[in-house]
Amino acid sequence: MDDKIKNYNNLPYRIGVGMVIINQKKEIFTGQRIDSARQYWQMPQGGIILGETYSKAVLREMKEEIGCNKAIIMAESRNWYSYHIPKFLVHKLWNSNFKGQKQKWFLIKFLGKDEDININTIYPEFSQWKWMNSNQLINNALPFKRKLYKAVINEFHIFLL
């Protein structure tokens, strides 16, 4: 077993950003990961490039993951949110350097049309996408992300009414 996995609890979090992208109906953009055999859905997220602001990172990640960043940032989370990945996944992600992610979340209003969304990007992360309400998202999310999603949606709930 990899020494890093043995020391799982001592591994740091990967710092990143996450986005709750909503359309005019206040539905949430979700994508099904291309590398997942199961039917789990998630919101877009990603890392931060050295020197990049969180807001620039979130708009860059949006463009990279859904092929479009016709949007405005409505809110930034007050809190940082984190999740642990299961130990059996550590060796598959981030060269076994992290136990999970610590993220700043943004609520983003999508200003484009569905036709503007193109998940077939240079480095695709999603095999398919759809708009969901918050309950559908939580019920269909990866189990280790559900608590985080509930907390983020709770913080942004006023925008989702």
Curated annotation (Swiss-Prot):
Q: Which cofactor does it need?
A: a divalent metal cation
> What residue stretches are annotated with the Nudix hydrolase domain?
12-154
Which top EC class is given? hydrolase
Kindly state the positions of the motif Nudix box in this protein: 46-67
Q: Which Pfam families match?
A: NUDIX
**Biological processes per GO annotation:** nucleoside phosphate metabolic process; ribose phosphate metabolic process
E.C. designation(s): 3.6.1.-
Q: Which PANTHER family match?
A: NUDIX HYDROLASE 26, CHLOROPLASTIC, UDP/ADP-SUGAR PYROPHOSPHATASE
Function text: Accelerates the degradation of transcripts by removing pyrophosphate from the 5'-end of triphosphorylated RNA, leading to a more labile monophosphorylated state that can stimulate subsequent ribonuclease cleavage.
Under HAMAP family, the record lists: Nudix_RppH
In the record, the note on similarity to other proteins reads: Belongs to the Nudix hydrolase family. RppH subfamily.
Q: What is this protein called?
A: RNA pyrophosphohydrolase
Q: Tell me the gene name.
A: rppH
